[in-house]
Amino acid sequence: MRLLLLYDYPPQPAGLSTQGDLLFRGLTEAGVDCLPAPRTGDLQKEWMYKCYKPSAAVGIGWWGYLPELVLHPRRFGIAPVPWLVADGWVANYQDELNSLPLILTTSSWVSETYARDGISHDKMVVQPIGCDIESFVPLPKSHPKIRAIRESLGVADDEKLLLTIGGDAASKGSQEMMIALAKIDSEFPKWRYVCKVWKQERTERQNELDFSLAESLGIRHKITYLEGVLSREFMPYLYNACDIYAGPSRQEGFGMPHVEAQACGIPVLSVDAMGIKETVVHGETGFLAGVGEWISIGECEVGVEEGYPERRLVKFPEPKVVAVRANTDDLAEGALQLMTDDKSVGRMGSAARRHVERNFDYRDVAKRVMDLIAERVPGARSA
């Protein structure tokens, strides 16, 4: 078997890039003949099709990337195998997806979303994303490198640090977390909340809205937003610096930070919905709040990015659920429990580590992807 991997390559410290790069590492370590390529680099991809002659091209992304991940390799006779996340609904490419022998999805929620919007369930196999469990390991708060991070963030030894990571914090549930933390601030005031976000125009606007909310709640002085790039090598230390990973995402097809935090022995506070409920075990590796609100849309504007020749408005026969908001009372209860019961947190942290070791080792993921391709893609095993 010879595989070409199409993803955000060269690797960047971002979710889809990490997903692809860990698959590449796992396949290589398993002895599979494979090479990575940038999903948007048409010239390089065509050159690799002709010179490398892969038996299949595994593409990492969402359905909007289908021109790069599926249509392009197929034009050159290469069997495409997309490994897809979701963004709430599938607006196009149903025929192209249904013509494939194998579609990998990152969670059952992603599969359900695609099936609701016209993709055959028989085509899809759930394959969670892998985690580098040798890099993401538990470290004590007394570790010099962990203490250095907490000191740089201004977190005292007796304060609990909550961490959220995302392109923007609001999509990862930061506003729900702020409301929850404000509810319990008088009962347990010794906490700090740090959000790691990407510096971009959209994020800047969203940050201002988040800060306004924090100001109105009287907790702005306890909120820190980090911008700029952090390397993959640094992230295990940042996770270990926190006491709770707070990720009640509004939309989440998997939840890579949730898994990485658990690998570091950090309990997760999130929401019982979407891909998250498949990565976090409520009461065992973290706390999952109920859904406070289901967000539905009845129409959506689509255009070139979604494969249409021009902008148009698509109206649905019935509303589609595309996101959630976590119940803030539940989040407050979970946060208070995790911040005040160190013994339970210790047990959850140990269980979280075992959970990731059993279910999300990137090497096991790579072997399963290899087996699925050999089983489902005609000619891949012998190529």
Which residues are covered by each model-predicted region?
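Carbohydrate-associated surface elements
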Residues: 109, 130
